[in-house]
Each structure stands twice: as structure tokens, then as C-alpha cells.
């Protein structure tokens, strides 16, 4: 294992990533903190081992950038050939995701509409939305006003009928 220097702390995998991986892999198992630390150290050492071997392969092929093929060759030469098919699948998935991101970011560029025009159109849409919202609020206010007027009229007619009924009772008392 590599010696523990101050720089090694900077080169470890984030513990949150390891914790997430452990929970996804072993959801019903409790893992002690020292076991988690051991997993972090093993992952870090594995990455150092693979990257060093990939770097040597890269240098032998007189390249300056480590490519996925160099990493795959490193896995093979270190005896991890059984992982290569899965690594290739993950590599393909990563390429697909990256391609989708590039396509999504270039959609705006492919529209052929200047940014100023897009901003103007956006402002128009915002203005229309504000106008529609104001109209809806106005309609709701008018409906509330009509409901209040109807309630007042109903209360007034109920009050008038109550007063008419009570004055008739008084007339009936006078007749007695």
C-alpha cells in the first residue's frame, strides 16, 4: 500500500461516495466505521495501482494522455481481466450520457436564432403570462364581488321579510 503522506488525504475517494456505494450494494447490512475506512483505502490503492499501470502503458505507446484503452489494458495486465466487459459497458454508458449532454447544450446554438432575439421572445412570453395572470385575478375579483352583492341582497331580503313578519305579528296583537 502507498505510504500515508499529507498528499494521500487529498487523493482519497469522498467518504459520502463510499457510504452511498455501500448502502446501495448492501442495503440491509451495518458496516463499521473502520470497515468503511478500509474500503476507502482499498479503493484508493486500487485506483493508484490501475492509474500507474495505465500511465506506464500510455508512456510505452508514446502518448501523453491516458485513454480508456490504456486503463483496460492495465486491468488486463494486472489480472483484472474479468472486469473488462463490465468496464466497457460502463464506458459506453458514459459516452452515451456525454453525447446527450453535448446535444442538449448545442440545441440552443442549432436554433439559428440570435441570443438577443431569444431574450426578446422570452420577455414577451413573460409579459403574456403576467397579463393572463392579471386577467385571472381580475375575473376572480369580479366573481367575489358578485357573490358578495348576492349575499347582501339575500341578507337584505331576508331582513325585510323578517321585518314584515314581525310587523304583522304586532297587527295581530292589536286585533286581540
Swiss-Prot record:
<dbReference type="GO" id="GO:0017054">
    <property type="term" value="C:negative cofactor 2 complex"/>
</dbReference>
<dbReference type="GO" id="GO:0017025">
    <property type="term" value="F:TBP-class protein binding"/>
</dbReference>
<dbReference type="Pfam" id="PF00808">
    <property type="entry name" value="CBFD_NFYB_HMF"/>
</dbReference>
<protein>
    <recommendedName>
        <fullName>Protein Dr1</fullName>
    </recommendedName>
</protein>
<keyword id="KW-0238">DNA-binding</keyword>
<feature type="compositionally biased region" description="Low complexity">
    <location>
        <begin position="152"/>
        <end position="167"/>
    </location>
</feature>
<keyword id="KW-0539">Nucleus</keyword>
<feature type="region of interest" description="Disordered">
    <location>
        <begin position="152"/>
        <end position="176"/>
    </location>
</feature>
<dbReference type="GO" id="GO:0051302">
    <property type="term" value="P:regulation of cell division"/>
</dbReference>
<dbReference type="GO" id="GO:0140672">
    <property type="term" value="C:ATAC complex"/>
</dbReference>
<feature type="short sequence motif" description="Nuclear localization signal">
    <location>
        <begin position="100"/>
        <end position="103"/>
    </location>
</feature>
<dbReference type="GO" id="GO:0005654">
    <property type="term" value="C:nucleoplasm"/>
</dbReference>
<dbReference type="InterPro" id="IPR003958">
    <property type="entry name" value="CBFA_NFYB_domain"/>
</dbReference>
<keyword id="KW-0804">Transcription</keyword>
<dbReference type="GO" id="GO:0000122">
    <property type="term" value="P:negative regulation of transcription by RNA polymerase II"/>
</dbReference>
<dbReference type="GO" id="GO:0090575">
    <property type="term" value="C:RNA polymerase II transcription regulator complex"/>
</dbReference>
<dbReference type="GO" id="GO:0051726">
    <property type="term" value="P:regulation of cell cycle"/>
</dbReference>
<dbReference type="GO" id="GO:0051123">
    <property type="term" value="P:RNA polymerase II preinitiation complex assembly"/>
</dbReference>
<keyword id="KW-0805">Transcription regulation</keyword>
<dbReference type="GO" id="GO:0045995">
    <property type="term" value="P:regulation of embryonic development"/>
</dbReference>
<dbReference type="InterPro" id="IPR042225">
    <property type="entry name" value="Ncb2"/>
</dbReference>
<keyword id="KW-0597">Phosphoprotein</keyword>
<feature type="domain" description="Histone-fold">
    <location>
        <begin position="12"/>
        <end position="75"/>
    </location>
</feature>
<dbReference type="GO" id="GO:0003677">
    <property type="term" value="F:DNA binding"/>
</dbReference>
<dbReference type="GO" id="GO:0016251">
    <property type="term" value="F:RNA polymerase II general transcription initiation factor activity"/>
</dbReference>
<dbReference type="GO" id="GO:0046982">
    <property type="term" value="F:protein heterodimerization activity"/>
</dbReference>
<comment type="function">
    <text>The association of the DR1/DRAP1 heterodimer with TBP results in a functional repression of both activated and basal transcription of class II genes. This interaction precludes the formation of a transcription-competent complex by inhibiting the association of TFIIA and/or TFIIB with TBP. Can bind to DNA on its own.</text>
</comment>
<keyword id="KW-0678">Repressor</keyword>
<comment type="subunit">
    <text>Heterodimer with DRAP1.</text>
</comment>
<comment type="similarity">
    <text>Belongs to the NC2 beta/DR1 family.</text>
</comment>
<dbReference type="InterPro" id="IPR009072">
    <property type="entry name" value="Histone-fold"/>
</dbReference>
Amino acid at each position: 500500500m502507498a505510504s500515508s503522506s499529507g498528499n494521500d488525504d487529498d487523493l482519497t475517494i469522498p467518504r459520502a461516495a463510499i457510504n452511498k456505494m455501500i448502502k446501495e450494494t448492501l442495503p440491509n447490512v451495518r458496516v463499521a466505521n473502520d470497515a468503511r475506512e478500509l474500503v476507502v483505502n482499498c479503493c484508493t490503492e486500487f485506483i493508484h495501482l490501475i492509474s500507474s499501470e495505465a500511465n506506464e502503458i500510455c508512456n510505452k505507446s508514446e502518448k501523453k494522455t491516458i485513454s480508456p484503452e490504456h486503463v483496460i489494458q492495465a486491468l488486463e495486465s494486472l489480472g483484472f481481466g474479468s472486469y473488462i466487459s463490465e468496464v466497457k459497458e460502463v464506458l459506453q454508458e458514459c459516452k452515451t450520457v456525454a453525447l446527450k449532454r453535448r446535444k442538449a447544450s448545442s440545441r440552443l446554438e442549432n436554433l439559428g436564432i440570435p441570443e438577443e432575439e431569444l431574450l426578446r421572445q422570452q420577455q414577451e412570453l413573460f409579459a403574456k403570462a403576467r397579463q393572463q395572470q392579471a386577467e385571472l385575478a381580475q375575473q376572480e375579483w369580479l366573481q367575489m364581488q358578485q357573490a358578495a352583492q348576492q349575499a347582501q341582497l339575500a341578507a337584505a331580503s331576508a331582513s325585510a321579510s323578517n321585518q314584515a313578519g314581525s310587523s304583522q305579528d304586532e297587527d295581530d296583537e292589536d286585533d286581540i
